[in-house]
Amino acid sequence: MRTLWMALCALSRLWPGAQAGCAEAGRCCPGRDPACFARGWRLDRVYGTCFCDQACRFTGDCCFDYDRACPARPCFVGEWSPWSGCADQCKPTTRVRRRSVQQEPQNGGAPCPPLEERAGCLEYSTPQGQDCGHTYVPAFITTSAFNKERTRQATSPHWSTHTEDAGYCMEFKTESLTPHCALENWPLTRWMQYLREGYTVCVDCQPPAMNSVSLRCSGDGLDSDGNQTLHWQAIGNPRCQGTWKKVRRVDQCSCPAVHSFIFI
């Protein structure tokens, strides 16, 4: 049977009225195209109208030379561009990178991969160099008792004697917190139990948590107008977290010890 099929194909090339399929007709079409046909042998060994469109694979009416005349070619893309800057300054937004198509897919070849990627982004300064963006950074806090163990001498050589002591205190009113805070009972994490909704707490900003350039601590909420909900997270248990609102900035903290914390 195979010999007969090969013989018929050979005879079709000698028949004056016969075309050899897609190659001789010069046809290769994407998708389903009823006008993309030729005269010749089909893959199902029937002579007559055969097709050279991509859908012929599913309908079974391709010309016998479709695979050779119309090989599948995958999509090729170029390299990623560099990441763009943040779409906006001083607030959470996105950055983007793109790549272009070097060769479109043909004849059922692999489709193109994503041509654009986005990622979260937050810039901490304006184009003019003004410090910003701290409102959206969670405040990482721990008990003020940790300050007794932490040296006040910053490691950066840029710190002067004047800036070593240039700290400040932020007062916040707690709005919400997760139940995980109350579950802590280890000696070094028991301080989390004293975080309560509705209480005013003090958080001290001191070196080395204080940035040596901006002289601020991340997440201090200093730019907030007092109505904005800010986020905090306890160091030692990432599931102990919550929200608060800024009350004011003061030079020295004056809250009870159990409601006194420090920025990390």
UniProtKB/Swiss-Prot annotation:
Q: Which InterPro entries match?
A: SBSPO, SBSPON_C, Somatomedin_B-like_dom_sf, Somatomedin_B_dom, TSP1_rpt, TSP1_rpt_sf, TSP1_spondin_dom
| Cysteine disulfide partners in this protein | 28-36, 28-52, 36-70, 50-52, 50-63, 56-62, 63-70
Organism ancestry: Eukaryota, Metazoa, Chordata, Craniata, Vertebrata
How is expression of this protein distributed across tissues? Answer: Detected in aorta extracellular matrix (at protein level).
**SMB domain span:** 24-75
**Annotated protein name in UniProt:** Somatomedin-B and thrombospondin type-1 domain-containing protein
Q: Where is the TSP type-1 domain?
A: 74-127
This entry carries the following GO cellular component terms, namely:
collagen-containing extracellular matrix; extracellular region
**Where do glycans attach?**
227
Give the chief site where it resides. Answer: secreted
Q: Which residues form the signal peptide?
A: 1-20
Q: Where in the cell is it found?
A: Secreted, Extracellular space, Extracellular matrix
Matching entries from PROSITE patterns are given as: SMB_1, SMB_2, TSP1
Superkingdom of the source? Eukaryota
Name the protein family. Answer: Belongs to the thrombospondin family.
User: Which keywords describe this protein according to UniProt?
Assistant: Disulfide bond, Extracellular matrix, Glycoprotein, Secreted, Signal
Give a single Pfam family match.
Answer: SBSPON_C
